[in-house]
């Protein structure tokens, strides 16, 4: 399983090793075939804003976007599954500048926020969505389970990319995230989001 990270954001504080680790864990947890590949692109706000408008017709920057390619479904890595051969899952695009402000409002650090967004993006690559309320609840519950299990797995391996956050925004429900989205929108001043203070980049 190959996961490539392309950091074109010029943003400090992005732990690429952690992103690869959580992505590999999520794909294994979803039983994705080990021959599958994906990329993680890390970009600045103007770039993701352009993608947001061009692909979703939504103004303003965002935290994560997913661009699926080959269709792989959960369970494709099981011994009894048909062997699909090498496949390119697609690309996840992350914006750390936006994500850091979002993390500040949620009460945790950039590292955890990017890990959460990586899992979220992978679930989108695998066909999960949150348009309908029930789908949204199911997707966010799965996202939180994967993320929590990843922290447990890190502890068992003796690896740490920062402490596991315990605040209410660390493993959000769909309703929690919707409230955060609204808070981010309200914080927009003159087209730019207000910068947080005293940020934890772990």
UniProtKB/Swiss-Prot annotation:
UniProt keyword annotation of Repeat present = no
Q: Which cofactor does it need?
A: Zn(2+)
Record keywords: Cytoplasm, Endonuclease, Hydrolase, Metal-binding, Nuclease, Ribosome biogenesis, rRNA processing, Zinc
Is Metal-binding tagged as a keyword?
yes
Q: Which residues bind Zn(2+)?
A: 120, 124, 130
Q: What does this protein do?
A: Single strand-specific metallo-endoribonuclease involved in late-stage 70S ribosome quality control and in maturation of the 3' terminus of the 16S rRNA.
Q: What is this protein called?
A: Endoribonuclease YbeY
Q: Which organism is it from?
A: Corynebacterium kroppenstedtii (strain DSM 44385 / JCM 11950 / CIP 105744 / CCUG 35717)
